[in-house]
Design a protein with these regions (language model features):
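Compositionally biased, intrinsically disordered or flexible polar/acidic segments
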Residues: 2-472
Length: 472
């Protein structure tokens, strides 16, 4: 299998000449910015000081707008957006006008309200512009304590339609709050590295897909709340996912300023509070530790995933002293990674995107460790953050094999057995067709993007140059 190497002067000389050493100081202000408090008649300020607008009598909500619910005795300290909710007994939709076409963040908030409603009858799907976002059966065990589902969806029309569909007429759907926010242009790049047991190659066309955030962790640091993130994200501590324990592993905290640069990772890609903490491997003697730091994340089988690893050298005392390898699902993704070769300076953030299959038995692993260029008495590996995003499958679903069209068609026909039989037959036919095609083509040709015959340093330079040009 090909390994990814980072040659020194040749590949990055032109890139470093272009790289601007000016800190990115612009503040992101989304053009489309909807914060909806479902079931409420007025505005509500949440715990992160954001104002959510009630949807009662709102033009965003379709005529079959369901019923609003409210709790009379909310739990102390709970967010006000979970004091109300809206229940739907038939397909109902929110229609958002879009002024800024492109990628949008969509967050759906669910929490059971203590109103006497029997939530065992809450069985539903959530659709958005042809995507099937959610089958409620996948979250029903956790919605008592609150669930936030986050997606990145490309919207090329002037409308984003989010539809709630009960599985049948005796069931209902519910939601507590909805966020729709236009994403910054640099949030998702079109290029990534496809890593598997057989291949390690560049692919393009990533932006044609949708994404669901599955895990977002700050490595070595505390929880980062939405108040401290310019895109109002939550970054959880990594402790429960860390699988490595060795005396050479430690946490570091950086009290200085993170050096954001034009063309590099922006604050919207990752906040200061994530980049100024990390876990490192460091040799304290004349030998380099023979150990990797590894994390294991549970994921759903049958999907591909975008794995984003965040790096910021906040631990080295000088440039050119940190070299390490990066692995995804046990396969080499980067060899001899030198962060300052890419960024030019210390404490400047960089991220790398990888596309992988789910791994073994629904577990996805990432690791960093010393390389054959690592030095003694120096930092030998570092990681600041990890994001794992599910990529929609071939029918546009993030949660099962049904597509959005099938869900709506099933409801319109009264959930009849004939329709379910036909859907099952169509699914079996599609599965057989896909298996036949898979046997006659390579793995890389079955995904929706195309491969690029280029070296990774050129791809990184291209990504950074494109982002810099878009900011000018």
């Amino acid at each position: 299998m090909a390994k990814l190497k980072l040659p020194f002067a040749l590949c990055f000389s032109s890139f470093l000449l272009f790289f601007t050493l000016v800190l990115s100081s612009s503040v992101f202000s989304p053009i489309d910015h909807y914060l909806i408090n479902c079931g409420s008649h007025g505005s509500t300020v949440d715990l992160d000081h954001r104002r959510f607008v009630g949807d009662s009598n709102s033009p965003l909500l379709s005529s079959s707008g369901g019923e609003s619910l409210a709790v009379s005795n909310p739990l102390p300290g709970s967010s006000p957006i979970y004091h109300t909710g809206r229940v739907f007994t038939r397909p109902s939709k929110y229609v958002f006008s879009i002024r800024d076409p492109g990628a949008h963040l969509v967050r759906l908030h669910f929490q059971v309200l203590n109103t006497g409603l029997d939530y065992s009858n809450a069985q539903f799907y959530v659709l958005a512009n042809g995507y099937l976002l959610l089958d409620s059966s996948s979250i029903e065990k956790t919605w008592n304590s609150g669930v936030i589902k986050e997606y990145i969806i490309r919207v090329d029309s002037d409308k984003l339609v989010i539809t709630f569909v009960p599985v049948k007429k005796s069931k209902f759907a519910f939601v507590n709050a909805i966020e729709v926010i236009s994403a910054p242009k640099d949030l998702v790049a079109d290029l990534a590295q496809y890593v598997s047991s057989e291949k390690n190659e560049q692919i393009s066309g990533l932006l044609k897909n949708g994404f669901e955030t599955v895990h977002r962790v700050s490595v070595g640091g505390p929880k980062v709340t939405p108040f401290n993130d310019s895109l109002w994200r939550t970054w959880l501590p990594d402790d429960e996912f860390l699988k490595s324990h060795d005396d050479s592993l430690s946490k570091v905290y950086y009290s200085g300023h993170i050096q954001y640069q034009n063309g590099g990772a922006s604050r919207e890609v990752g906040p200061d509070n994530m980049y100024n903490t990390a876990r490192i491997i460091k040799s304290s003697s004349d030998s380099i530790p023979n150990v990797n730091m590894s994390w294991a994340f549970p994921v759903d089988e049958g999907y591909k995933y975008l794995v984003r690893m965040h790096f910021c050298d906040i631990a080295s005392v000088a440039r050119g002293m940190l070299y390490f390898n990066v692995y995804v699902n046990g396969y080499m993704a980067y060899e001899n990674l030198d962060l300052t070769m890419i960024t030019g300076i210390l404490a400047s953030p960089f991220y790398a995107d990888f596309v992988v299959d789910e791994g073994l038995s629904g577990v996805l692993t990432v690791s960093v460790g010393p390389s054959n260029m690592s030095e003694t008495r120096a930092v030998d590996a570092i990681l600041n953050g990890v994001e794992i995003m599910k990529i929609n499958n071939s029918v546009g679903s993030f949660d099962g094999e049904f597509c959005a069209h099938s869900v709506l068609k099933t409801w319109r026909t009264g959930n009849g057995g004939v329709v379910l039989f036909l859907l099952a037959a169509v699914f079996l036919l599609l599965t057989a067709t896909m298996l036949i095609k898979r046997r006659s083509s390579e793995i890389g040709d079955s995904i929706v993007w195309s491969r690029l015959p280029m070296e990774i340093p050129d791809a990184i330079s291209k990504r950074y140059n494109q982002l810099s040009s878009s900011k000018v």
